[in-house]
Swiss-Prot record:
Location relative to the cell: Cytoplasm
InterPro entries, per the entry: Urocanase, Urocanase-like, Urocanase_C, Urocanase_central_sf, Urocanase_CS, Urocanase_N, Urocanase_Rossmann-like, Urocanase_sf
Catalysed reaction, written as an equation: 4-imidazolone-5-propanoate = trans-urocanate + H2O
Source organism of this protein record: Rhizobium meliloti (strain 1021)
Cofactor(s) it depends on: NAD(+)
Record-annotated active site: C410
The protein's name in its UniProt record: Urocanate hydratase
Cofactor note (record): Binds 1 NAD(+) per subunit.
GO CC annotations, alphabetized: cytoplasm
Family that this chain belongs to: Belongs to the urocanase family.
Alphabetically ordered keywords of this record: Cytoplasm, Histidine metabolism, Lyase, NAD, Plasmid
Pfam families to which the protein is assigned, alphabetical: Urocanase, Urocanase_C, Urocanase_N
Enzyme Commission number, as recorded: 4.2.1.49
């Protein structure tokens, strides 16, 4: 029987100013959907997989074709509804409504398990959208580089006096998200040893310049790390192997990194994590023939992996969970101390979230890198005092290879996002940019996610699992006029552990776009300030008052 998710075709986004849809507001999601499946962007485009285990852009290739046809035919007062990667309806709305509304992999809480999802998935009734895979705003590994960089820099401030020179970071996973780690480490001044079981993933990161070297033995990798750290030269190496085997061996040998984390796809025990002692071929075959055996073996391996991370933590090495839910699996497997080391958000990132600062990203629909370089200069012009951001933009231009449509990410917050959006829109209007820009973000943002083992871990008021906030964020972005809005479940940490929302807005140079941009790019980060102010964070309360937010049940107005 033919697999409806397999096709050998090659998809790439159109470039230039000629459009095949009826307006840029529908051409934009069309191009970004196609960009998600560009072979230079997606991890497994022939299977519709963008990143993150089985994070897909569309449910089947037939659904992809129907989405494309629907977008090309969509009028300026119509909205396309997409249910778990399947286009299910077109309805008349109005010009300021989103052109696309997306809901991916959402399940009633009692049934929000991998077992139930996988059953639906096999029947063709669901699709795992991850975060930006099914919401069509993945920009390649760059999308997580700055967040990882900010985490490593802050860890360096807290633990090493502000410098990571001569230090090295041990991690696992070089997929679409984990692949950011070696480059982020090098940008932060550190060396990085990343363990990865898939040689194709290592080669992908080498090809896109996210990784410097590869090694096939621990001895070879450690020789590089020792040489680089001694010279104070920040470089990275990908070690072919299984993290669940390599990390315990490093503990036994007394090897001591300066920081430990992990970004294997542990959120998905069947499709994302290679069990100890298994070959890649055996793993791939048994995922189809005996998924329960794969899951059992993978979960046991994750426990061993986390035990090794705890050994590093106990020896005084800064150790952090990077949001793949590996601690939860280890705890479920009987490792009571699995949560002794913290997640990266409460340890290093939450103060940024309190001010609505998060992963603001944009892509040039023209396909011309010069459009991104012009926007880089505009960001510096509008934020002249943010030298840290200027340094990031300089490093990004020098080190980050574009994947698919040229794009940029930089972390900015409430009060700055809408200013940048309006400036980009004016650049489109004036012809300074060759074609419209789309602005979006990761679902990992200050007001758009409930994920008790990641973004909302250890909230001050204990509201870690309250998921009203991402629902309100999606509703507000819809009401504000985002070009497309998405609401997902299970991204990052897997089924049952997160709900989150995303938005994208198109800057097409029109007055209508300017009005929408001002609303969306103010309201979206403002919900993050609101959420953290409600949880009792003084930084967020101060930010809310400084920005004049009206929060009657929070500020006591």
């Amino acid at each position: 029987m033919n697999n409806p998710r397999h096709n050998i075709r090659e998809v790439r986004s159109p470039r230039g100013t000629e459009i095949s849809a009826k307006s840029w507001l529908t051409e934009a999601p069309l191009r970004m959907l196609m960009n998600n499946l560009d072979p230079d962007v997606a991890e497994n485009p022939h299977e519709l997989v963008v990143y993150g285990g089985i994070g897909r852009a569309a449910r089947t290739w037939a659904d992809f074709d129907r989405i494309v046809a629907s977008l090309k035919d969509l009028n300026e007062d119509e909205t396309l509804l997409v249910q778990s990667g399947k286009p299910v309806g077109v309805f008349r709305t109005h010009k300021d409504a989103p052109r696309v509304l997306i809901a991916n992999s959402n399940l009633v809480p009692h049934w929000a398990t991998w077992d139930h999802f996988n059953e639906l998935d096999k029947k063709g009734l669901a699709m795992y959208g991850q975060m930006t895979a099914g919401s069509w705003i993945y920009i390649g590994t760059q999308g997580i580089v700055q967040g990882t960089y900010e985490t490593f820099v802050e860890a360096g401030r807290q633990h090493y006096g502000g410098s990571l020179k001569g230090k090295w970071i041990l991690t696992g996973g070089l997929g679409g998200m984990g692949g950011a780690q070696p480059l982020a480490a090098v940008m932060a001044g550190a060396c990085c040893l990343a363990v990865e079981c898939n040689p194709d993933s290592i080669d992908f990161r080498l090809r896109t310049r996210y990784l410097d070297e590869k090694a096939e033995t621990l001895e070879e990798a450690m020789e590089m790390i020792e040489r680089w750290t001694k010279a104070g030269e920040p470089k990275s190496v990908g070690l072919l192997g299984n993290a669940a085997e390599i990390l315990p061996e490093m503990v036994r040998r007394g090897i001591r990194p300066d920081m430990v984390t992990d970004q294997t796809s542990a959120h998905d025990p069947i499709n994302g994590y290679l069990p100890k002692g298994w070959t890649m071929a055996e793993w791939k075959a048994k995922r189809e023939s005996d998924p329960k055996a794969v899951e059992k073996a993978a979960r046991a391996s994750m426990r061993d992996h986390v035990e090794a991370m705890l050994a590093f933590w106990d020896s005084g090495v800064p150790t952090l969970d990077y949001g793949n839910n590996i601690r939860q699996v280890a705890k479920d497997e009987g490792l009571e101390r699995a949560f002794d080391f913290p997640g990266f958000v409460p340890a290093y990132i939450r103060p940024l979230f309190c001010r609505g600062i998060g992963p603001f990203r944009w892509a040039a629909l023209s396909g011309d890198p010069e459009d991104i370089y012009r926007t880089d200069r505009k960001v510096k012009e509008l934020l002249p005092d943010n030298k840290h951001l200027h340094n990031w933009l300089d490093m990004a231009r020098e080190r980050i290879a574009f994947q698919g449509l040229p794009a940029r990410i930089c972390w900015v917050g409430l009060g700055d996002r809408h200013r940048l959006g309006l400036a980009f829109n004016e650049m489109v209007r004036s012809g300074e940019l060759k074609a419209p820009i789309v602005i979006g973000r990761d679902h990992l943002d200050s007001g758009s996610v409930a994920s008790p083992n990641r973004e909302t871990e250890a909230m001050k008021d204990g509201s870690d699992a309250v998921s009203d906030w991402p629902l309100l964020n999606a509703l507000l972005n819809t009401a504000s006029g985002a070009t497309w809005v998405s609401l997902h479940h299970g991204g990052g940490v897997g089924m049952g552990f997160s709900q989150h929302s995303g938005m994208v807005i198109c800057c097409d140079g029109t007055d209508d776009a300017a009005r929408r941009i001002e609303r969306v790019l103010w309201n979206d980060p403002a919900t993050g300030v609101m959420r953290h102010a409600d949880a009792g964070y003084d930084i967020a309360v101060d930010c809310a008052r400084e920005k004049g937010l009206r929060l009657p049940g929070i500020l006591g107005e």
